[in-house]
Amino acid sequence: MLSACCICASAQEQRTEVMIETTAGNIRIALHNETPAHRDNFVKLVNEQFYDSLLFHRVIKNFMIQGGDPDSKKAEPGITLGEGTLGYKLPAEITFPLHYHKRGAVAMAREGDETNPDFKSDACQFYIVWGKRFSTMDMERLTQRLDSASNGKMTFTPEQIKTYRKIGGSPHLDGAYTVFGEVIEGMEVVEEIQRTDTDDYDRPIDDVRIIRARVITRK
């Protein structure tokens, strides 16, 4: 009976995994079941080979790497990217505090608050968090800010504060963007990409390209 229960629990926890093969190395991500619309949309695009040959077109050191702009596939050097999309948006699936912007988190990009007050996600552009480590004082300030922005509905847990202090991330994004996955292998590749030299618009001088993305497992 115990074994059967364990097997059932394991099956419920199984997550879809995607391998992103890049010119800098491979990044393996697991998609959260708690964000089903984002998970299914991402898997659909991967299976359609949408991400193959696209660039990580926006890279900011100690912050994140962003890819998925369809205009980046054949973009000439020096062209500013980031406006390409698929013409639809995804309803927000913000599951904070369960999933948050720790180092390695995978989240969907979106338009700004003024034009997008419901925090709807872009259909295809995603980012992987690198971030930085924060001091206790930093986290106290960010906690006050989050509390104010959410009218007291959100706050950082002790575990999150510890993670941001010891491992790092981008806590200022919490509660405002949908985190739909996390890197489970290849953070050294993310680290290398986020260190790359960029132009004035955060595009890498030397293109970092997604060779292909493929689904590894499916629930």
What are these model-derived regions, one by one?
Residues 1-6:
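Bacterial N-terminal signal peptides
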Residues 9-219:
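Cyclophilin-like peptidyl-prolyl cis-trans isomerases
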